[in-house]
């Protein structure tokens, strides 16, 4: 009788732990509200981002290359097409194809299940708060910190790191990005 009670309690604890991690580890998908003070001009077009809780400015999901699909699948990245109007850079882009895991976009019950999208070559930017007229120029420009996510070239994504605190506290521009993973990013063959 006591053995059954102990086993039941252990089973309940195990189920609770799995459910807890399933809920806690799933990234929150959030679309932020664009703020016109963050509007900037890039080589590909105009973008507008948002203001983080700590006051830093952020831009999510800015394309840095064309989608590596079709004829571009096994090629070096190509510059993105210019866009018309203003790109609302307020949402993290899809992650690159990978199997679900701790650094992917799925919870623990989805480990080893495929996730992601080949149209994933986007970057995220955080900067201290500057109005358009007060952006540092020339020798006053801020340093840039590129954050390359880990994951053994098989898992991970640029959205796994939030650069808002670093940007605001240390007056630095923080950039994270997605890059092709696994065989879509690291496959080598003479025919390619």
Where are these regions (language model features)?
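Non-catalytic accessory segments of hydrolases
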Residues: 2, 8-192
């Amino acid at each position: 009788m006591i053995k059954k009670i102990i086993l039941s309690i252990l089973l309940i604890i195990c189920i609770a732990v799995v459910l807890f991690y399933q809920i806690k580890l799933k990234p929150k998908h959030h679309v932020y509200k664009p703020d016109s003070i963050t509007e900037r001009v890039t080589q590909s077009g105009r973008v507008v981002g948002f203001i983080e809780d700590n006051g830093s400015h952020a831009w999510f999901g800015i394309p840095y290359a064309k989608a590596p699909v079709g004829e571009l699948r096994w090629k070096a990245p190509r510059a993105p097409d210019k866009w018309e109007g203003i790109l609302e850079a307020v949402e993290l882009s899809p992650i690159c194809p990978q199997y679900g895991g701790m650094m992917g976009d799925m919870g623990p019950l989805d480990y080893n299940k495929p996730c992601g999208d080949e149209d994933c070559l986007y970057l995220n930017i955080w900067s201290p708060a500057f109005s358009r007229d007060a952006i540092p120029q020339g020798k006053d420009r801020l340093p840039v910190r590129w954050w390359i996510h880990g994951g053994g070239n098989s898992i991970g994504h640029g959205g796994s790191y939030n650069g808002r605190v670093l940007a605001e506290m240390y007056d630095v521009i923080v950039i994270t990005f997605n890059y092709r993973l696994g065989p879509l990013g690291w496959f080598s063959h003479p025919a390619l």
